[in-house]
Amino acid sequence: MKAGLVIVDRDGVINFDSDAYIKSVSEWVAIPGSLEAIARLSRADYRVVVATNQSGIARGLYDMEMLNRIHQKMAKALGEQGGRIDAIFFCPHGPDDNCDCRKPKPGLLHEIKDRLKVELAGVPLVGDSLLDLECAEAVGALPILVRT
């Protein structure tokens, strides 16, 4: 039986963020300690799920194939530490697209709830920005801020 669920943002939590976006595999660089922390959660039988805004897709900076390659690099790096990501949920829209899935709107978290058939009340959501915290609060999740 799984111990629980932890939702994490990607950029700025697992890997270093960039104002120029993470557009390629080479630009994805893990933050020291992040992979080990996720591996500890995995070994404790937590499901770890990523919820991330990826507006670089809408902006034409990278495509789905590149995003998948970046996520494959992340999964491989996590596997080498004994960790795993159980699912990745992302919003590909830009800030002016008025979608429901771009954080701080809670659509991405509702998708996690529906697809994984879980309740989100009290579930930790680890993020590095006010957007993440507001998103967590909108669904009753437990917002956890990391300063990287």
Place the predicted regions along the sequence by residue.
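Active-site neighborhood of HAD-like aspartate-dependent phosphohydrolases
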Residues: 1-49
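Alpha-helix N-cap and loop-to-helix initiation/capping positions
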Residues: 25-29, 62-69, 103-104
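Substrate-recognition element of Asp-dependent hydrolases with the DxDx(T/V) motif
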Residues: 34, 38-74, 84-97, 136
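Conserved hydrophobic residues forming the short capping helix/wall of the S-adenosyl-L-methionine
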Residues: 74-79, 113
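Short helix-capping segments at alpha-helix termini
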Residues: 78-84, 117
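Conserved Lys-Pro-Asp/Glu-containing loop-to-beta segment of HAD-superfamily phosphomonoesterases
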Residues: 100-133
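Acidic, Mg2+-coordinating phosphoryl-transfer loop and its flanking beta/alpha structural elements
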Residues: 125-148
